[in-house]
Amino acid sequence: MRTDQGTWRAPTVVLACGAATVPAVPTLARLVPAGISSVTPAGYRNPGELPLGGVLVIGASASGIQLADELHRSGRPVTLAVGEHVRMPRTYRGRDILWWLDASGLLDQRYDEVDDLARARNVPSMQLVGSPGRTVDLNVLSSAGVRLVGRLAGIQDGVAQFSGSLPNVCALADLKLGRLLNTIDAWAGAAGERFAPTIMRTAPLGLDLRSGEIGTIVWATGYRPDLSWLDIPVLDRRGRAVHDGGVTACPGLYLIGMPFLRRRKSSLIDGAAADAAELTRHLAGHLDALVGHRGRSAS
């Protein structure tokens, strides 16, 4: 490994740089008309730093709804483009929802127990805010005055084009939330509360970005890892490391802290310990094999 402090050599390397290294901005962002500011959550600080005018927030996962909420509270007109999302209450049955997910064992589900691992590793972040007991979802935002539109499908001649599938996307998120709460209730042994379905109002399918209505676009479209510096053939065509539970095809090269590495909670702070213990055993076995091989070679 070449660094600004010299070259390091090691028989094993663990990549713990995570999956949220750089913002994942879609290529159609280059079609945004001149004069409109584009910013990602990584570069956003507060509403006062944005140019005057309305704000179009692209993406309705954790960052998207939090920023839409803050911007609207500051007095900005906000339009929120909603794609696939994971609706989630902050609290359920008197406890934080993460307590239920952990206690019921849902976060302990292993990577070899799911039918579609690739999809499970790319599930959007839950629609949660950090304020205790405060839920912010599409109903809350819409009732407050945030305009909801469908997923951004394209930009043509300065007009943002939105998908017409918003009702179906929201209905699916509501359905999945209901299934999750049913699972928690089955573990708890009693039925709990249920939440009103997402209320849909008529959503425009287009927005003229040249009209002056929008001054800023916030690309809350997630993050991606950046392993471009890794000169080892373990990356797929998208630049993501191919691995089996953190073990790559390159002997001695491991990953940790990635989404659903070995468990649903792998990318959470309290989820790394179990993964680390299992990977350490594999790593130790690799080192033992190296020592044994060197010993046999020397003799």
What positions do the PLM features span?
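Flavin (primarily FAD) cofactor-binding/catalytic cores of flavoenzymes
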Residues: 1-299
